Amino acid sequence: MAGGNEVNLNECKRIVPLNTWVLISNFKLAYKVLRRPDGSFNRDLAEFLDRKVPANSFPLDGVFSFDHVDSTTNLLTRIYQPASLLHQTRHGTLELTKPLSTTEIVPVLIFFHGGSFTHSSANSAIYDTFCRRLVTICGVVVVSVDYRRSPEHRYPCAYDDGWNALNWVKSRVWLQSGKDSNVYVYLAGDSSGGNIAHNVAVRATNEGVKVLGNILLHPMFGGQERTQSEKTLDGKYFVTIQDRDWYWRAYLPEGEDRDHPACNPFGPRGQSLKGVNFPKSLVVVAGLDLVQDWQLAYVDGLKKTGLEVNLLYLKQATIGFYFLPNNDHFHCLMEELNKFVHSIEDSQSKSSPVLLTP
């Protein structure tokens, strides 16, 4: 066993850029300490270890951010805007009454951070940096959602928080843009955040709230069956099957298995999306993520119901490749994100996915 672990470690270090390997390995080590065998979680230690950063009242690298706490739900969101779009009074305070633009369309990206429903937050340094890069590179406004985490808050708490965030964003005059004064909303997230984005989009579809598109970065899906990628990649690139199982037990309702629709959206108990106006999707799959088969099954599920889906498959990418701009996968992702959020024309559903090759 020790020899196998050493082989996996050496292979991982050979493929993954050193800075990224160190970063994600540190997360992996901390996560292992925080999870308890009885299903509980050391939240106090997690908060101590999670490096957080405040919002910045002065633009940093052309991006301004501020926090908002909803007085009704107590939900915190962090809003990132290009400094060029800020409206300030002559006293320097924010003026949140004017739209972002009355001529140009400015996409608003509602972002759900990853962490397997359990780790990180909207003000975690690593996600703060990532959201800033989204603003700078893609020319969007980002609203990062500090949703409630498991195991203290199980299904469907994170989805409910995502739904509340969507409705709050849609009601903000100062997030409107374009000649028709709309809020042009996209949902996005990585890992568990991608799962949340999908489920919020399903609810938006059911309740007639318009979302222009979904962006899912190696979304966290699964099922009872063990897939080939789970067997082949178990423990090789940062994550084990046991890790994933622990997080699903911590998030799903007590007594549920991994074929619950929250985990397996197109599984035996999943909701059919056939004939509904579900938004177009960009699904990013890392070829070294052990749950990639479930992500590809998700793409196939969208395809079979006639929905528009773009698949960006990055064969040599691992989870978290986008945290640092030290690899070609990062730049490929940003290029595709930029194109996706700026192609807001309503398109007809397509019968097959578009495979994007880096």
UniProtKB/Swiss-Prot annotation:
Major subcellular site: nucleus
Official protein name in the record: Gibberellin receptor GID1B
InterPro entries: AB_hydrolase_3, AB_hydrolase_fold, Carboxylest/Gibb_receptor, Lipase_GDXG_HIS_AS, Lipase_GDXG_put_SER_AS
Positions contributing to gibberellin A3 binding: S116, Y127, S191, F238, G320
Keyword Nucleus: yes
Observed phenotype of the null mutant: No visible phenotype under normal growth condition.
GO biological process, one term: response to gibberellin
Residues where N-acetylalanine is found: A2
Extent of the signal sequence: none
Active site location: S191, D289
Key words of the record: Acetylation, Gibberellin signaling pathway, Hydrolase, Nucleus, Receptor
Superkingdom assignment: Eukaryota
Functional summary from the UniProt entry: Functions as a soluble gibberellin (GA) receptor. GA is an essential hormone that regulates growth and development in plants. Binds with high affinity the biologically active gibberellin GA4, but has no affinity for the biologically inactive GAs. In response to GA, interacts with specific DELLA proteins, known as repressors of GA-induced growth, and targets them for degradation via proteasome. Seems to be required for GA signaling that controls root growth, seed germination and flower development. May function as a dominant GA receptor at low GA concentrations in germination.
Gene Ontology MF annotations: hydrolase activity
Positions with a binding annotation for gibberellin A4: G115, S116, Y127, S191, G320
GO cellular component: nucleus
Tissues expressed in: Widely expressed.
Family the entry assigns: Belongs to the 'GDXG' lipolytic enzyme family.
Native species: Arabidopsis thaliana (Mouse-ear cress)
Location in the cell: Nucleus
UniProt motif (Involved in the stabilization of the negatively charged intermediate by the formation of the oxyanion hole) ranges: 113-115
EC number of the protein: 3.-.-.-
Subunit architecture: Interacts with the DELLA proteins GAI, RGA, RGL1, RGL2 and RGL3 in a GA-dependent manner.
Pfam families according to UniProt: Abhydrolase_3
